[in-house]
């Protein structure tokens, strides 16, 4: 579960960007108020692909959860900041701030608007990113393990 604003889950107060992972068979009562996302990873999901072994690793993002099948991390960039060239496995990206990112993949440049609370599937890729917006990039990434 990802809090999109103030919520209370099992007596624990959560703020925008906070997560809580529930293991298979674990039960909970959803928040009675507030905005949040629930992400369910099914046991028979398609096989995960990863970039080739010689690609550079993802930058040091804050790891929020590291499990056997996936890692959840928070990705942050300041306006004007450019990442080093890096790779990701297949992942879900949830954008928390409205801003713009420029990415260079395979020599091609693309600028995209990041829309808050939008959940997107992102393929395995090697790229460089730059925050070209006026506010920081803040994303929650659920990266699948092959």
Which positions does each model-derived feature cover?
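Short histidine-centered beta-strand/loop micro-motifs
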Residues: 11-12, 30-31, 75, 82-87, ...
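Surface-exposed beta-loop interaction hotspot
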Residues: 27-72, 76
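Glycine- and acidic-residue-biased ligand/ion/polar-headgroup-sensing regions
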Residues: 1-10, 88-107
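Short acidic-glycine-tyrosine-enriched beta hairpin
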Residues: 9-27, 106-125
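Ligand-binding loop in jelly-roll beta-barrel domains
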Residues: 24-45, 98, 124-146
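Short hydrophobic/aromatic-rich beta-strand segments that constitute the beta-sheet cores
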Residues: 9-10, 38-39, 72-73, 101-103, ...
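Histidine-centered active-site/metal-ligand motif
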Residues: 4, 26-29, 85-90, 127-128
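A short glycine-rich, His/Asp/Glu-containing loop-to-beta-strand
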Residues: 1-4, 56-83, 90-93, 141-142
């Amino acid at each position: 579960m990802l809090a999109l604003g103030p919520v209370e889950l099992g007596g624990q107060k959560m703020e925008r960007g906070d997560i809580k992972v529930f293991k298979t068979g674990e039960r909970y009562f959803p928040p009675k108020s507030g905005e949040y996302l629930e992400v369910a990873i099914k046991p028979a999901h398609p096989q995960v692909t990863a970039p080739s072994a010689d690609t550079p690793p993802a930058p040091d993002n804050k790891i929020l959860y590291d499990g056997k099948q996936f890692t959840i991390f928070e990705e942050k960039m300041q306006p004007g900041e450019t990442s080093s060239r890096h790779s990701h496995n297949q992942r879900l990206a949830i954008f928390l701030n409205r801003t713009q990112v420029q990415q260079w993949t395979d020599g091609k440049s693309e600028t995209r608007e990041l829309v808050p609370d939008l959940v997107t599937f992102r393929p395995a890729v090697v790229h460089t990113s730059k925050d070209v917006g006026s506010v920081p990039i803040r994303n929650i990434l659920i990266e699948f393990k092959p």
